[in-house]
Amino acid sequence: MKVVIVTSVASLLDASIQFQKTACRHHCNYLSMQIVKEIEEFGTINEKNLEFATWKDVIQNDEIDALVFYRVKQISISTGVLYESMMRNRTKPISMFFVRDCLAFDGDPPSFRMTSCNINAYNRNKIKDLIILMNMKTCNKKIIGEFIIDNFGSVNALLSIINSNVTWVTSVINNSNGRGINIRVSNNKMLTITSFRRFVNKLKMYKTTKCASQLDNLCTEINKMDIIDKK
C-alpha cells in the first residue's frame, strides 16, 4: 500500500510536526505501508487545501492508496466531505488513517472503523525512559519537559496514552526505583493507586512549564524582529 503522510499544526497546543511524522512513520512501518510523500500544513485542513499543486499531485495519482494523518482534528470539515472532494478527481477509492485516534475511514460506502493502536510499542519504550528520567535526581524540570514535548508532542497527549494504559504504566512505576533497577513492592491496592496518581499529578505540572516556555520563545522571536515605524 502506497501512502502519503499529512501533518499539520494549527495552535501551540498541537503536537509538533516532527512528533506527528515520527508517530505516522511508525504506524506505516508497522503495517508495511510504503511512504511516497509527506505533506506539511500550517492550520487545519479543508477543501481549499485540495486546490494547491501539492495536493492535486497526490489526489490525482491513483497509485496512492491512502492518506495517513496524525489525528482527526487536523481536518476542519467533515471527513466525508473531504473524501467526496478528493474523489471528484480520482477513479480509485482512497483510504484515510488517523494514527492517534486509532481510526480509519474507508470501505464502500466509506465510514469510520477502529484500528489497533500500533504506536503502543514506541510509546511504551518512551514512557519507560521518562519514568527513569523522573527518578534521576540529576534531571531537572527543563530536561524532562523537553523530553515530553520531543517524544509525545504535548503533556495532554502523554496523559491520554497513560490513562488508556493504566495497568501497564502502574506496573512499570512500581517496578522502578531511582536507579531504574527492579525492586519488590507491596501488592497493596491503595499503594498501587497512589503511585499512579502521584505520577499523573507530577506530569500535570509540566503543562504550565510548556506554555511558559513557548511564550518565552515567542517573545524572544518577536524581540529579534526589526519593526519599522512607518509615518
UniProtKB/Swiss-Prot annotation:
Keywords, ordered alphabetically: Early protein, Host nucleus
Compartments reported by the entry: Host nucleus, Host nucleolus
Induction trigger: Expressed in the early phase of the viral replicative cycle.
Superkingdom, natural source: Viruses
GO CC annotation: host cell nucleolus
One Pfam family in the UniProt entry: Pox_F16
Similarity-based family: Belongs to the orthopoxvirus OPG058 family.
Listed name of the protein: Protein OPG061
Organism: Variola virus (isolate Human/India/Ind3/1967)
Gene: OPG061
